[in-house]
Structures are given as structure tokens and as C-alpha cells.
């Protein structure tokens, strides 16, 4: 493998794009056309950068990935960024490793709020962008309008004149072609490679100084343990070299580097020596944390810690206490759940976990509902069982005043739904900032809304727009609290009054009371929520009742039982649906919704105490 690297031929670049604007496909094509793939393996899996099952399913990138491409003697390190503000912790770290950003924007949609979030961070780091207008071949593409939108966005984000003088490349990643004009695309991606080489500066580093690097990502491997990934700030590193590790508190310890791993395509390979400016992985240093500095034993200097946005949403993770606990999951105890959460903390820097006075409950805080639901979904797939409460926003005391988080929301809906959506957002204390009709029957709305107004809104929004609306949000700022309750659920729920098998006959009778959430012949337990009541109060119902068979020849004997299809919630929908006195029970097999207090008597008693305390 190559040992020497000409620093002037090295380029480090991060890719920024909104969900579904074609970032992952673009990287796939760059890897193929640079010939990097032929050397590692024959055929290429679609979406090679998304390595986690959840990422492939949802089409979102959660964890940042690294890959390297060799093109005409140049070596280009490409780091993928999560496009979603909920993963702000990941974004910060990626930007500390690169010298420029590649902003991929859809030729029809234009820049979206999640792109805005990452771009803002990139400008704050002083990085200069290269803009790729992707999907220029799609019907309705309007590349010139998109370029204007991008320019306006950059001006709004306070870009410098240098940053505003950005090169534009037009591309169709799916077909693997790019060009400097959208009417004239080259045969392949060469114009994009040339733009990267020409406009991205090589890393400004000192090759002869003592070694220093900061860990900005962690990986784990059963054979070598913790792997630290980062960009070498100065100097060079070899396997077996003794180093000093400085953690966030400034404590130092000695260590010896195991392997030094470089990236090529999606593979890692061992190097004999790595130089400043390159992005590498090193093993053999035991427990590492993000932001640790690794340096030469004779020049112990810590690099400034990486800052991460504070969490804005918190929820409780509890041990599953339902009557069906332990039937479907492998890990069910509080110790196992806490161990898993602590393991997550190692690389998920925007997460916080606090123990509570109740040993079976942990307070977990993150950057948003998506951030936390991805963690819950991952735990569920690994065989964990747990119950989670409704998300609540985190208030802050700023200058003696209590403040709450606000989000910037972009909504894209058909004109016929505009009125009802605006009314619903008004009730949730949203303020309109902008309104852009696209002239083709759709409208884009920009809002600033308190984060608590968004909790539970997505499901309602999808129903309101019959699934045709798009809703994107990203954290904006903290500000004074808006008075009044926001976003309470309008409907009550149907609650099972006993444990057993739900029978079709009983469910048939309950259909007129509301929408059911379970199929016939499913096991339910007392206190489980089996449907949505059509009125605003909760109703405890019997869904185990069979048909009485005494009057065999009664006239109603042959009425066929027809059950409507039940409402099935995904994990996110369930978390958004529940109220403060309810929990979502999450197991590897099922997602159930239940009341915190399972018996009707307990609920009535709790209700009485809350009413009496509120009247006194």
C-alpha cells in the first residue's frame, strides 16, 4: 500500500444534502467512476454509504461515514454528514475533519431546512462550499430557480463574499453524469472531480511537527476493541508508536498505537505511516472518547474540545412492567437497559442519560424525537424490551427567565390543504415566516413554532393532507415561553378492562365507538389501549366477550362480522400519539400502547387526587 502522500494532492470534503436529494447515490457513482471499486470488489451494492439497516430503510443517514477515492494521483477523502438536525452532534465532528463542503441540492425542491442547519454549521467553521444541483433530468426540474434559492439561503446564513463565490456543478447522479451547464452534461462525473481538485484547498498542516490528532468518531471491532477515527492535525504516526492521550477533563495517560488504518473506497487497510491532513483510524489505545487528543509523548498539547448542541427533548425509558413483560425480548432488566444506554453514550455525543430516584427509570435526553426514536428502534432490534414515556421539551433558565426551544418548520402541501394546515399550526402557536406558491398547485410554508407544538403533530398533519404533505423541522433557538397548553390530543382512547384474547364479536361491537388498533384474536392485557375513542373521554371496554350461544335460532344469528382494518402505529407515531399518563411498550416483536396505571380503579383514584389538588 502507498506510504508517501503528497499533501498538495490530498482533499478532505464533507457532503451535505437533504433527505432523498441523492447524496448517497452520488457517492456510489464517484466510487465507481474513480475505479476505486474495481480494485476492491466487483459489483457495487446500491447505497453503499448507508451501512446501518435503519438507514437503508428510512433513507436517512444517521452516522457519519468515511470513504476515500483515488483519482488521477489525487486522493479525495469524502465524509458523509447526517442531513438531519436531530443528529447535530455528528455534524459538528465531521466538519472538524474537512476543508470544504459539497452541498447537494435537488433541481426541483431547492434547499430544505435540514440542509440549512448543516450549511450554517459549515459557514461557522469557515468552510467554502461547492454546490451540486442534482437530478437535473427529473421532470419539472428548475435548476436556475434553485441556484437563486441557494444564493439567497447563503446570504441569509451570513456567508462571506468568498463563500458566496461558489462553483456550481449540474449532475444526474443516477445516470452518473455531471457538467458545468445543465443543458450540457459530460459523459461522466469528471467535471465534479475537477471542481473538487480545483476549488478545495489541500489541508494546511505541519508535516515535520510532533504528532497530534483529535478523535472525532469512534468505531468498535471485536478483535481490536475501540477504533478512534480523526484527521491528523500535524506530524506523522506509525504502528507501535508510544503516544499520550488527553481526555476532555485534561487528564493524560500513556498508550501505544496498535494499527494505523487508512481508508480506500469503503475498506480500511493497514498503513506503515500516516501523515498530517489524512483521515485515519487507529487501534490499540483502549477506551477512547470523542474529542480526546492523541499526541507525541514529548509534545503534550490538547486540542480544544468539540462543542455539541445541547439536547432539547427528554423522555423516560422504563423497565417494561406490563403483564406480557419478558415474553418477546432478550434483555429486560434495568441493569441491561442502563448498560446499553451507557454504551450508546460513547459515540452518540448529543445524548444524555440520567438515573432517577426510581431505579427502573432513566431520563434520556436528545436533539429531537427522531434522535431518540432511532435509538429506541435500534435497541428493539437488538432484543431489548422497554417502555417509554411521552417526549417533553427541556426548558432553560436564561437571564433569570424560563425559556423553551423553538423549531424552524418547512411545510410543502397542496393548495387545497393549506387552510387546514395553517389553522392547525396557529392553534399550536406557530408563526408564519414565509409563504411561496410554486405555481403548480403546491405551497411551501415556513414557520417558527415551539418544539412542544410539534410533538404529536406529524401524524395529524399526514391525515390532514391525505399523506401528500411534506414536513421538515430543525432546531432554531431558545426563546420566551408561549402561554397556554399546546397540542393536546383531541380524542380519548379505548382501554381493555381485562387480560385475554380479543374476540372478533366483541371488537365488532366496539367499532362504532372509534377506530380499533388491534386485530381479532390478539392477546391483550388490562390497561392496554386497543383503540381511539371517537369522543374526547377515555372509555374502558370489554373486548374479550364472546357471542352467547343460548338462543341458537335467533334472527340475528347469521349477521356476518366485518371488522375494519385496524390503525397500526409505527414507533414514531406511537410516541407522538401518547398522552402524559400513557406509555409505549416496545419489544422486538410488537409496539403496544398502555396506560401507566393498568387498572381502572387506580386510574380513577389518581384522577380524583389530581382534581382535588387542582380545586384546592
Where do the protein language model's features map onto the residues?
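Conserved short loop/turn motifs at secondary-structure junctions
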Residues: 14, 133-140, 177, 181-185, ...
